[in-house]
């Protein structure tokens, strides 16, 4: 399957004079302290560090909130900052008028009381939000850029629907994890267009909620390889009790495993002696022949990381940082890409990366539930051209 034909990504460059702030709407599940709504929209309202300082050239003019828990912040923030708190998504985009009155939309379907399915997916209303946003654009005859927090779907059928709708509308569309642009320890990456001989990914926490972060972080490194990205041919999910067997079979590169485990705060013996029953050992078989194990190790690993051996023989391992100060800064770097898209009309980097990893995770969760069967993924042969995009701290928040 080729790329989905959404508006092409462009890399940002340079510094410049202060631009006019673009008005944006936001559609969120909940708005409470330290929610994704807070750590993204709060940076529009209060600056990159959420301390009243400089921030993006965006203005939040309207907000739709789907659920109002006791700890809701949106009502008081609307009074303080003057944005419109809306009863419908259409109102958020039109400000109650007869036209699209904003230049961009942030859709944040994360947190809140929503059901789970039998595959362990938390069914946030990301498709419903996206459908109502794009229905409103169609109704009023104007398309503006949309950012979807985390992965589309989360079910693959819904992610595919969203991709097709974006293609039909020629919608500038971004999605994905803040961890792809976060700080790394150590600060290392695969050189642009370097070949990859082997790789290992490590994740922690829930298979759905943090599996997507793990897969997308790994993908933002692997997409840089010399073959470009041609997509995924098959996936399989095994129990963590099979990790020792996978090592014996050569499915996991031994040195890379040790490097990746050390980078994420654990070690081989801790994992092999007591593999977490609520984890999983994922295998991702790429179209170009690369097969990558991704081990989800809740209670063992202390973070998300990867170890890579490139075709020169160089080995490196890195862990993504999830800093809390100054107020979850990786979300500032995510917001920087969103700001770029809203000002240029072009995604800062390809949505296909997130779409691919969303599909990989969905199929892996199915494999895990259905007796660990290997799944041929003809629908994940998603080819795309990556962007040589920076991550913290190499991305300038004051760049225009």
Set out the residue ranges of the language-model regions:
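Rossmann-like dinucleotide-binding domain that binds NAD(P)(H)
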Residues: 199-290, 296-299, 356-359
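A structured beta-alpha segment of the ubiquitous adenosine-cofactor-binding alpha/beta core
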Residues: 81-115, 129-138
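Beta-strand-loop-alpha-helix segment that lines the small-molecule cofactor/substrate pocket
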Residues: 110-179
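NAD(P)-binding Rossmann-fold cofactor-contacting core
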Residues: 34, 52-79
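N-terminal export signals
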Residues: 1-16
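Short beta-strand segments enriched in small/hydrophobic residues
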Residues: 21-30, 198-201
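A short, Lys/Arg-enriched amphipathic alpha-helix followed by its capping loop at the start of a domain
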Residues: 39-58
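C-terminal helical cap and adjacent loop that interface with cofactors, partners, or active-site loops
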Residues: 19, 72, 300-400
